[in-house]
């Protein structure tokens, strides 16, 4: 604690003494993201305002660093009025600082959320008065069309360069005060512009706020004939083809545009869910039917465009060309007030036309003329000039009120062609001046030691002040040695900032690990292994959500059952992790599992297991699906077996048994994690609590748990879920090795068909396939719940007192960081590990079972507790490299393994021996208990037989007496 406190105080001292980055002075923190903080900066000489995005390199893995450098390279080549410009980039040994345009009205998500209060803001008062917001509706359609025109202009510019943004969402659409406000407000502060026309809209209204597309961390060059396969972006606005892990093209941005448009006109996203898997289910089940709220006032043209954009099949989705030529984008905005109706340019008399035109040609050139002149001047000028020339920027129409503004012409809504946009980019000649500068390494005391919280993805630019900007010349190109940005003294948050924090959950983006994809891909491959002949009826399919391809087939579709979260939200109660699920009889366990396997197989993979191999029967919905008993000869029937099944007769049987053993251990760990999850999330997130809904803080507070309790439960649940994921991943690794070996053998074996015809081989393949499909389903489910718990943990840590060791301000660099299959950069309290929790739980269960055994109470329950404790202790001893070559699937997998090893604290041999001794002790108790149960069962059978004999004797005697009395 003392170390963390001293580190925090050292960080505060650093921020007081060093507040300069190159030629800019850092004023205050105005935003925070997952890996970066955004500061308000000003030029030392001119005082022009900028936004400084400071990224701590130590918090980035290899993939995120590539995204950051990709963003820098892309922004260097882009210059457009509706794209946030990069002024400069300064790098040190620990941080990268991006000097960018400052957008003081915040982002579009805040604008939509505060739409009812726009009338109270002096910079949006006139807009709200002219185009009011209807009750319970979104923005006025005039404003929506205005923003769409500007967004389309930016996207057309990107498509001309074969760029795909991949993260279009309201949080990445930043706003500036309207050009009229900027031109007429004499008290406005200077804002450094990226180019001479940076504050001149290319489309839309001059009286409405100006929109700029920001955050190119996921952008990349993607020609129209190419496909990408990386899952990235924000889940709420992510295209379904990305959610399905399919390859996708630039049309993914069109889906995001559709979601943004829908949110602007209705005030809410089109699809809301607790996680991206549930989100995909809702998108798929909608059937491309987009409904609008009754309160929304939306024209038919706008509805048609939104529906064309929100087609789940990218082939059916509207094209970029059709979007750019759509009447909503190209035609004048209907419903404008008189002041905003474009006026034709004033015709000059012949007398004044000639001298004025010469003056305009020399002083105020048109956009294309000034562009060519500017480029010609720059080609002949030395490279010591800054990124943009002050003179063209001062000659902007915004600085000259009497200059004709291009957007006021009748064709202002037409987007300039490619050559008019790409050709005037000053990034080409300024590339050398925007190269990343590496000043001398600073002392360690100059670096902030307080890393930003993982999920606190706040507004990216500025909500701090609401003053109209004025363009200012760029600063001198010389850079002073960079020092770290530091947060100023804590200031009370403004209303806008608090509102922005309410939607912090929507700002998170998803980076799905390759292990997730590998698990699903392997399960898909194994599921296609030849099965027994199926009837035509059982071959009807619905494509699985994560399977590649477009799920357009609806023939014989089987509706998906409610997700587990939905079942809980609808009132299904959870059971204890070691209650009824572990105590079900073999017949009951098999019945529910059989039905689940049949339904899941038909829905996901296109075949059913043969009905005669699976038993039937109803069963109540358990808290979680128990690890199933698969239809194979001599397989155990309970959830957890004692493992005494004899030695497998062949290699395939041994592999199947090994896979099931690891899966069974993971199921026990999962059940323990569910106990924590049940306390943490009594009801699963619903439409009102999750993506696009109420803040996570609200649901936690309503549960009546303190912040410390939530942190403790979240940490324990998270490490247990990660342990379960590790065991499941190991099972899939074993299956992967078996699958590779089997394919290799069959490819060289000429008698493969004969082997496959064997009933035993077929049943064994069915057994392994069933296990793999169960593991895939459980893996995906655990991954979802781990993400929910991670978000709960991060939010709860922020609500702790600032002097609490788990508060984000006190996270030292050497804090326990969980870097696993599902989480990155989560800080845990000291002493938290899944192995310790599992060991304590196993001891507790064993002691309770021993007490009940001595008292002869609930002996079957004691047997279940002993078996569960043994499986949990075996999971404690289970290491990632036991009985298996070290996994080397990808770089990400290596990092996962490292994180998992750090989490388990690498048990030494002495600790392992202690755990093994406990396992032996519990096994002995289990053996004694089973002998007692067999004796009780034998005695019970003997008693039943004796009672049966007595009953038969009584019947015989009764019959003799009756027969004697009849003749009399």
Swiss-Prot record:
Span list, region Disordered: 334-500, 528-585, 884-906, 939-968
PROSITE patterns registered for this protein in UniProt: PROTEIN_KINASE_ATP (PS00107), PROTEIN_KINASE_DOM (PS50011), PROTEIN_KINASE_ST (PS00108)
Residue intervals passing through the bilayer: none
Record EC number: 2.7.11.1
GO biological process, one term: response to starvation
UniProt subcellular location: Cytoplasm; Preautophagosomal structure membrane
Main location: cytoplasm
Description of how the protein assembles with itself and partners: Homodimer. Forms a ternary complex with ATG13 and ATG17.
The protein's role, per its UniProt record: Serine/threonine protein kinase involved in the cytoplasm to vacuole transport (Cvt) and found to be essential in autophagy, where it is required for the formation of autophagosomes. Involved in the clearance of protein aggregates which cannot be efficiently cleared by the proteasome. Required for selective autophagic degradation of the nucleus (nucleophagy) as well as for mitophagy which contributes to regulate mitochondrial quantity and quality by eliminating the mitochondria to a basal level to fulfill cellular energy requirements and preventing excess ROS production.
Protein name: Serine/threonine-protein kinase apg-1
Organism name: Neurospora crassa (strain ATCC 24698 / 74-OR23-1A / CBS 708.71 / DSM 1257 / FGSC 987)
The gene coding this protein: apg-1
